[in-house]
Amino acid sequence: MLINIQVGDVLEVAANVLISTANPWLNLSGGVNGAILSAVGPTIQEELHTYLHCQGISAVPVGTVVQSEAGNLPFECILHAVAIDPFYDSSVELVRETIVAGLDLAINAGAKTISTPTLATGYGPMSIADFGTAVAPLANEPKFDEISLTIVVRSEEHRSELFEAISAARVSHRR
């Protein structure tokens, strides 16, 4: 998998699929989710709440990825990835498992290009470097060879931090 790091607004980086942050209640309440709600209106929020209602649940388990429409955003669909628990805790392993679930779902949807913010780093406890550590080993997974992942960060400082973490994790993973 080719991993690109870009500074900007994740909602403006066109890709086949956006893997977005999500909380267990699938509420579009802040950060990237709040930006989705502002850009698209209540349609996606209603779709996510309908999903919960149809499942007979009020929240999804940690690691769940739920697909929705993308509205007027430059994606074929949005994959809402829950990489935090109800207390907003997370780990490198949980982020990696959640990203893998999202990438698998994206591939099944026929995606070749995927964009994502750094999951569990806003309201969640993870650092940008932790996210890099979680994602780096996936670059060498054969099942992801045909896709590219663009990780979108908000600053040049975060881009540098993420690049260093991914580079360091790749070196230690090869040992």
Q: At which residue positions do the language-model features occur?
A:
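Phosphate/ribose-phosphate-bearing ligand recognition and processing surfaces
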Residues: 84-175
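Glycine-/small-residue-enriched capping loops at alpha/beta junctions
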Residues: 1-108
